[in-house]
Amino acid sequence: MPEGKIIKALSGFYYVQHEEGITQCRGRGVFRKNKITPLVGDQVVFQAENQNEGYVLEVFERKNELVRPPIANVDQAILVFSAVEPDFNPGLLDRFLVLIEYHNIKPIICISKMDLVDEPMRKMVESYANDYREMGYAVLFTSVHAAESIEILKPFLEECVSVVAGQSGVGKSSMLNVLRPDLELKTNDISSHLGRGKHTTRHVELISIGSGLVADTPGFSSLDFIDIEVEDLTFCFPELKEESQYCKFRGCTHLSEPKCAVKAAVEEGRIADYRYEHYKQFVEEIRERKPRY
């Protein structure tokens, strides 16, 4: 039986890419019975009479799975945040990073619209960028008006499945249009009333760019820490994870425990204050979450 990867799911059809091309398939009823929904990114077994009539027979085990957006087997996330319009938002970036780290997906931070910033804003954004690089993250500066700045992203996309995510209105679709001009993905200007863009992407689709596949997702419609527990959170902050091994108490939450290495690192300036503040904010949010039964 042939195998392939689902690159688009739309109106009950699954578009499976394989060695011979792309075949439009439906899911077998057994999937509904077993409460399995094939996802974009799934590696599958299928059978087909022709390119327009096929059936997905089996879904292979996933290495990870996102719910919103619904996509599986993601290698890395390109997190696009603008320097201005809307202004750079480290709190929202950290929220994305936690969600991505929790799913064992490699994050790459891409800061767009650097051509629009004044000098004070440039210095502030570059300072944040240096902080994130010290934490071990790749940080790229891009502008859709300077195509060569987008080109630096291409090597990161090779031989892997990437999701492009980030704040609405920061230029995700514009960036993909530069990488693949034939796409002509819809873009929206920023609403001056809201200071943010409207989502312009309506379904998840994997797009070929070089030897890689990139998902232009409809954005993360939920940024809540639904599945994350307090004890997971430390491991989603690389610099906290590094210091936490020196805490006196195993399972230290780095809030009120004595001889906490994380708090000591914050006081000594080895962990950025804003990162620790975001960590505390997220702990509070998780603790206030209504229990699920």
Swiss-Prot record:
Its cofactor is Zn(2+). Keywords: Cytoplasm, GTP-binding, Hydrolase, Metal-binding, Nucleotide-binding, Ribosome biogenesis, RNA-binding, rRNA-binding, Zinc. InterPro entries: G_CP_dom, NA-bd_OB-fold, P-loop_NTPase, Ribosome_biogen_GTPase_RsgA, RsgA_GTPase_dom, RsgA_N. Its EC number is 3.6.1.-. One of its GO terms (biological process) is ribosomal small subunit biogenesis. Zn(2+) binds at C247, C252, H254, C260. GO terms for molecular function: GTP binding; GTPase activity; metal ion binding; rRNA binding. The keyword NADP does not apply. This is Small ribosomal subunit biogenesis GTPase RsgA. It comes from Bacillus cytotoxicus (strain DSM 22905 / CIP 110041 / 391-98 / NVH 391-98). The gene is rsgA.
